[in-house]
Regions:
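Cyclic nucleotide-binding regulatory module and flanking cytosolic helices
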Residues: 1-2
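Surface-exposed recognition segments
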Residues: 5-19, 34-126
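Short, small/polar residue-rich loop motifs at catalytic or cofactor-binding pockets
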Residues: 24-27
């Protein structure tokens, strides 16, 4: 998206909606498309208690693996976490426009602004 995100898409880059992978330079970590193209599915269950429980341990947690189950007493649908925001973000349903932005989404959701977030471990690089 070109213009003043998220208010004005001028389409100067030729992409009114989705942009092909690697349309923009990698970030300082060598990662592409971490925010703004599509929301990215993660393998994490949406559990409103998980991070509060971690914080209550008063210790540094390195690479938390996420909750074992979904939990939200206000919504009984089982949900996974999506991260990063998309080209369709607006103030009405995007809390922020950053890589760590997260939302709960039904596991059977299929939208053009949902994709996958893949990861690579050091062992996979070797």
């Amino acid at each position: 998206m070109e213009g003043e995100f998220p208010l004005n898409n001028t389409s100067e880059n030729g992409y009114e909606r989705l942009a092909p992978v690697k349309s923009y330079p990698a970030n300082s970590f060598g990662l592409y498309d971490m925010a703004g193209n599509v929301w990215e599915w993660t393998n994490d269950w949406y559990n409103i208690k998980y991070y509060k429980e971690l914080a209550s341990q008063n210790k540094t947690i390195i690479n938390p693996l996420g909750a074992d189950t979904a939990y939200n007493p206000n919504n009984t649908y089982i949900k996974k976490i999506i991260k990063g925001g998309s080209f369709l973000c607006s103030d009405s349903y995007c809390a922020s426009y950053r890589v760590s932005s997260r939302m709960a989404t039904d596991t059977d959701s299929a939208q053009e602004h949902l994709g996958l977030r893949t990861v690579e471990t050091q062992d996979m690089i070797k």
